[in-house]
Amino acid sequence: MQTQPVPEHQGWASRRPTILARRMRAGIAVLLLAVTISGCAPSAVHVSQHDPDNLRPTACEQAWTRARQSERLQKEQADTRAQAWVQAARECPARLDEATVHAAQALAASQGGQASRQTATLRLVQAAQRLDPLAKALPVELADQAITGEDRSGFELSVLAARKTDAAWMLTLADAHTAAAQILVGHAKHDPRQGVYPTTDLLAHPDECTDPANGIQTPTPALIEMDTARTLLAVGKKLNGSSGTIRTDASQNAKSHQQATSALVDMIVAHMSMAMILGYPATSSALLQTPKH
């Protein structure tokens, strides 16, 4: 028996459900893909637009990284290393002590002998001459602390100089302290300077003494410089606000703020480097001790 051919229109009708099902499945897949892509697109754009900002390092982080990298420089590039750490101290007041110690170490390591003492004295004189912006930013209590610290150091150095025959450099150093106190008192509400301070311990140990902060034996002029640096470090720490920056009057602009910060950092580094050049041990553990008096 022969099989009758199926009419063409009947074959199409029998295959239509299968074809329609395939087309429907393909359409649904395309629709789902479009929804998925449209749903994911905003997230991708959000990440690409905002993540770089969230990961961008702060000014402090950038300055600290550059300072750490500068440690690879050679000894003859100590000024560059010191400046990198000075900038880190300006940008990271919460790490003021550590950064200023590194800056002073870099300066002291590159120098030696009488020439370095003259250079360090000049640096201190110049730093003192730039203290006016800091004087404007200091509240009364901290101004008294900074002024008295500088004035006492100037007096003590002048007393030591009077006992020596070749102490012209020490008188110049004493004058720098006195000038710093004078500039700082220029914007103070009162003058806390005593002019004369106790000398019993000083005269008992005019050449070498013990640092009460850590028990280290050091030349007396070096300890005077280190104590002055520590006094200013304490002032700087108390000036640090909750945002990690030096507090200034609301009317002061960004430039005045920057100048006050720079003046404080430069003076601390000048005192520290002078202390090291005069014989204070240049180890970080000794330099970061807090004085007990």
Please provide the spans of the model-predicted regions.
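C-terminal motif of bacterial Sec signal peptides marking the signal peptidase cleavage site
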Residues: T36-G39
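All-alpha RGS (Regulator of G-protein Signaling) helical domain and cognate RGS-like helical scaffolds
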Residues: A41-H293
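Bacterial N-terminal signal peptides that target proteins for export
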Residues: V6-I28
